[in-house]
């Protein structure tokens, strides 16, 4: 059984002793809002928009003796203004603690307790981003309660909230019965192997969740293998992120199991396996599976230990695979030989790949120029990211020519040519497959699709 989260200030115990032992019990005021008739339920659902979310939040904080969080108050005021303008349908409430130029008071588990009481009746809010706050396991408990009550929520972002294995267990178990949530981000919460196993067990039951992000969650070998096993049967998950597990073996057992899964799963569209210690034998396992897989469109194997020998297998499978559209090979070591293998395939055989990232792969001019030549003959191949390699003059001229000829749009690459004293150089541009994976501004140029090209090219399910 998960550890009991501490009861926030102002919560008064009620109910049976068993219920009280398991979780914070309802206060009389909270219980009084539970509608007993359809008419009363409708009145509760309409309470927030009529009185205003900001006012409702202030009143609840006073009632529960909870300190008002000015950040939450400001965001709810913005939502109230949208409602007044008639923009109340399908709102994503953005209370992320890291997307403001001015420092904000981050949301704690106790703050989320009050917020969840408001949101459970807001049927026009279908997305919630509370990433980069201080929810901890207390907040995870109330997030689980919210998923029980709020049946319109399709997107929930809890990334980097210091949620541990116990909090992960609470979230995973409530998803056994939830049938509305489509996209869950748990990124950066150290739920570890124990929490990962609960999420894997959840996927045996849940048939509605489409995207699950468990990157940087300290998953263990056991849980990664469990996910690979479960996904041979789960037909709902379209995208899964298993980045940076804690692996102690050099045998690549997890990659072997993922390869077996890809042979049987024909629903998965995006697979992220960054920092899995994948070597050439591991990429061979994945490529062998891709001969039989007809659904995967986005493969992320960045930050691994793949060399030019591994590119032999990838280049070969790309000759016959017609579904892969985005491949992220960033921060490996494919060098000139690997780039040449890919270039030959993209020039003469493959007409389905749209985007390739070879950032920081120790590629020199020969390999980079070869890839640029592929873009001249392959009109489908439209996005390439090459920063962090060894540019010579021929490379700079080749990519400058690509952009000037219109074969490569400036937004579809991470370099920009400039001339000094008659010589062409390349500067870095902030575009990429997942440049703003950890943080995306809600305004300005960084919100353009070019900044997150991989996600724009391969949209999965409902977007937040």
Curated annotation (Swiss-Prot):
> Spans of biased composition, class Low complexity?
16-32
Q: Does the keyword Cytoplasm apply?
A: yes
Q: Which organism is it from?
A: Homo sapiens (Human)
**Primary location group:** nucleus
Q: What InterPro entries does the entry give?
A: Leu-rich_rpt, LRR-containing_regulator, LRR_dom_sf
| Primary role | Highly expressed in stem cells where it may be involved in regulation of pluripotency. In embryonic stem cells (ESCs), important for normal expression of the pluripotency regulators POU5F1/OCT4 and KLF4. Also important for expression of the ectodermal marker gene NES and the endodermal marker gene GATA4. Promotes stem cell proliferation in vitro.
Query: Which Pfam families does the annotation name?
Result: LRR_6
Q: Where are the LRR repeats?
A: 295-315, 323-345
GO cellular component entries: cytoplasm; nucleolus
Q: Does the keyword Cytoplasm apply?
A: yes
Subunit composition? Answer: Interacts with NPM1 and NCL.
Q: Which SMART domains match?
A: LRR_RI (SM00368)
The protein here is known as: Leucine-rich repeat-containing protein 34
Cellular location of this protein? Nucleus; Nucleus, Nucleolus; Cytoplasm
* Keywords, alphabetical: Cytoplasm, Differentiation, Leucine-rich repeat, Nucleus, Repeat
Q: Any stretches that span the bilayer, and where are they?
A: none
Annotated region (Disordered) at 1-48
Give the record's GO biological process terms: cell differentiation; gene expression; telomere maintenance
């Amino acid at each position: 059984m998960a550890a009991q989260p501490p009861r926030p200030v102002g919560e008064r115990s009620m109910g049976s002793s068993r219920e009280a032992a398991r979780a914070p019990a309802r206060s009389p005021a909270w219980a009084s809002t539970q509608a007993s008739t359809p008419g009363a339920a409708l009145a509760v659902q309409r309470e927030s928009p009529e009185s205003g979310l900001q006012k409702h939040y202030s009143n609840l904080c006073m009632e529960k003796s909870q300190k008002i969080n000015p950040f939450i108050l400001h965001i709810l005021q913005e939502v109230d203004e949208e409602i007044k303008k008639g923009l109340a349908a399908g709102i994503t409430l953005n209370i992320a603690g890291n997307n403001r130029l001015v420092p904000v008071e981050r949301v704690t588990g106790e703050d989320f307790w009050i917020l969840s009481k408001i949101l459970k009746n807001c049927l026009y809010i279908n997305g919630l981003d509370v990433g980069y706050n201080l929810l901890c396991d207390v907040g995870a408990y109330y997030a689980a309660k919210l998923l029980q009550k709020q049946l319109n929520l399709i997107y929930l972002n809890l990334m980097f909230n210091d949620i541990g294995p116990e909090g992960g267990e609470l979230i995973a178990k409530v998803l056994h019965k939830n049938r509305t949530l489509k996209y869950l981000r748990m990124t950066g919460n150290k739920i570890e192997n124990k929490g990962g196993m609960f999420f894997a067990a959840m996927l045996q039951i849940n048939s509605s969740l489409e995207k699950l992000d468990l990157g940087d969650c300290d998953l263990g070998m056991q849980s990664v293998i469990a996910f690979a096993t479960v996904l041979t049967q789960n037909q709902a998950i379209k995208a899964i992120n298993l980045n940076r597990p804690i692996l102690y073996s050099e045998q690549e057992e997890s990659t072997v199991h993922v390869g077996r899964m890809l042979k049987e799963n024909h629903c998965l569209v995006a697979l992220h396996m960054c920092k899995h210690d994948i070597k050439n034998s591991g990429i061979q396992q994945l490529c062998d599976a891709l001969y039989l897989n007809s659904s995967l469109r986005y493969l992320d194997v960045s930050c691994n230990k793949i060399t030019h020998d591994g590119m032999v297998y990838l280049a070969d499978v790309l000759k016959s695979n017609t579904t892969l559209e985005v491949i992220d090979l960033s921060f490996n070591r494919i060098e000139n030989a690997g780039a040449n293998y890919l270039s030959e395939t993209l020039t003469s055989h493959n007409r389905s790949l749209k985007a390739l990232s070879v950032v920081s792969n120790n590629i020199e001019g020969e390999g980079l120029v070869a890839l640029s030549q592929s873009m001249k003959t392959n009109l489908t191949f439209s996005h390439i990211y090459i920063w962090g390699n060894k540019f010579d003059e021929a490379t700079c001229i080749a990519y400058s020519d690509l952009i000037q000829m219109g074969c490569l749009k400036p937004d579809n690459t991470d370099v920009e040519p400039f001339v000094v004293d008659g010589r062409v150089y390349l500067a870095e541009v902030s575009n990429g497959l997942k440049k703003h994976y950890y943080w995306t501004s809600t305004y300005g140029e960084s919100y353009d699709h070019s900044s997150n090209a991989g996600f724009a090219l391969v949209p999965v399910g409902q977007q937040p």
